[in-house]
Swiss-Prot record:
It is found in: Mitochondrion inner membrane. Keywords: Electron transport, Heme, Iron, Membrane, Metal-binding, Mitochondrion, Mitochondrion inner membrane, Respiratory chain, Transmembrane, Transmembrane helix, Transport, Ubiquinone. Belongs to the cytochrome b family. The chain crosses the membrane at residues 33-53, 77-98, 113-133, 178-198, 226-246, 288-308, 320-340, 347-367. It comes from Microtus gerbei (Pyrenean pine vole). One of its GO terms (biological process) is mitochondrial electron transport, ubiquinol to cytochrome c. This is Cytochrome b. Its main location: mitochondrion.
Length: 380
């Protein structure tokens, strides 16, 4: 078996990635989320495939086809709710994975980090288009509002929006193409994940100290396969509790009303995992400015290696930047809350304050804190 594992052209790739891979001996449970994201992707592709067998991407029948899946297909309700809540679990793992990367300075592995940012954008695009497919009120109006933001692009904006819509409003053509893209993107994401892993295995994993761990490596199997399996069990437990006991808790009641272009819902808002970005978008009165802030709220991650001023990689031994980091986490929670609130006093001013704080902490306060720590520890 050992000979096949190490010699066979295909199996040796798996061997070098998941079995004989040298891994740092001290990586904590924060390093579990990569494998959990892989599991989430697999769940989403499988449940999505079975949903696609019964779904029709036509404005006249889309809403009914989802109802049909839930009522008439064997375990269709389970597949549908696993897919909907699987997206939420996916984003929880994504945010924790990115948060881990920021905390421990993993962004210094630039190729892996940039690939991760591309993956984040791809997953967000996929989730957005998936939300449109049930063709409920929030699906329709969410699609209208978000695609309409592109009209803020000077000169080509309006033409671009109509081109994406396939007409003069969100309609049959839009739904069909969104279904096509929603179906193909997860497979593109899977390919990008392999590239992400390829880049990661060029440098090896980071670890909680942020120090070089070449002198102390252990094989991935059995140590981290077992450790990852515990994470899998915890995730599946949480996932099943969410899906079987509270399937609609993260959804919007408006999406149980069929799409009606003549009736606008009182509060148009995206799924919970986009609310922080939506709050940043709404906090700027100018349309183009809002769109740029929205994109920059994610794209700012790409500038993290440039904003790293400390002589140490991780935040493990850096209490000042640690404080900044947790304030940033709290700020993101505030933004998420504000994104779901109506546009009125006092929510407008809270959202604007939180948006300014978000960019200030990342671009100004954390780099300054890094320099202060260098001076305190006399690392200059």
């Amino acid at each position: 078996m050992t000979i096949i594992r190490k010699k066979h052209p295909l199996i040796k790739i798996i061997n070098h990635s998941f079995i004989d891979l040298p891994a740092p001996s001290n990586i904590s449970s924060w390093w579990n989320f990569g494998s959990l994201l892989g599991l989430c992707l697999a769940i989403q592709i499988l449940t999505g495939l079975f949903l696609a067998m019964h779904y029709t991407s036509d404005t006249a029948t889309a809403f009914s086809s989802v109802a049909h899946i839930c009522r008439d297909v064997n375990y269709g309700w389970l597949i549908r709710y696993m897919h909907a809540n699987g997206a939420s679990m996916f984003f929880i793992c994504l945010f924790l994975h990115v948060g881990r990367g920021v905390y421990y300075g993993s962004y210094n592995m630039i190729e892996t980090w940039n690939m991760g940012i591309i993956l984040l954008f791809a997953v967000m695009a996929t989730a957005f288009m998936g939300y449109v497919l049930p063709w409920g009120q929030m699906s329709f109006w969410g699609a209208t509002v978000i695609t309409n933001l592109l009209s803020a692009i000077p000169y080509i904006g309006t033409t671009l929006v109509e081109w994406i819509w396939g007409g003069f409003s969100v309609d049959k053509a839009t739904l069909t193409r969104f279904f096509a893209f929603h179906f193909i993107l997860p497979f593109i994401i899977t390919a990008l994940v392999l590239v992400h892993l390829l880049f990661l295995h060029e440098t090896g994993s980071n670890n909680p100290t942020g120090l070089n761990s070449d002198a102390d490596k252990i094989p991935f199997h059995p140590y981290y396969t077992v450790k990852d399996f515990l994470g899998v069990l915890v995730l599946l437990m949480a996932f099943m509790i969410l899906t079987l006991f509270f399937p609609d808790i993260l959804g919007d009641p408006d999406n149980y009303t069929p799409a009606n272009p003549l009736n606008t819902p009182p509060h148009i808002k995206p799924e919970w995992y986009f609310l922080f970005a939506y709050a940043i978008l709404r906090s700027i009165p100018n349309k183009l400015g809002g769109v740029l802030a929205l994109i920059l709220s994610i794209l700012i991650l790409a500038f993290m290696p440039l904003l790293h001023t400390s002589k140490q990689r991780a935040l493990t031994f850096r209490p000042i930047t640690q404080t900044m980091y947790w304030v940033l986490v709290a700020d993101l929670l505030v933004l998420t809350w504000i994104g779901g609130q109506p546009v009125e006093y006092p929510f407008i001013i809270i959202g604007q304050t939180a948006s300014i704080a978000y960019f200030t902490i990342i671009m100004i306060l954390m780099p300054i804190a890094g320099m202060i720590e260098n001076n305190i520890l006399d690392l200059n």
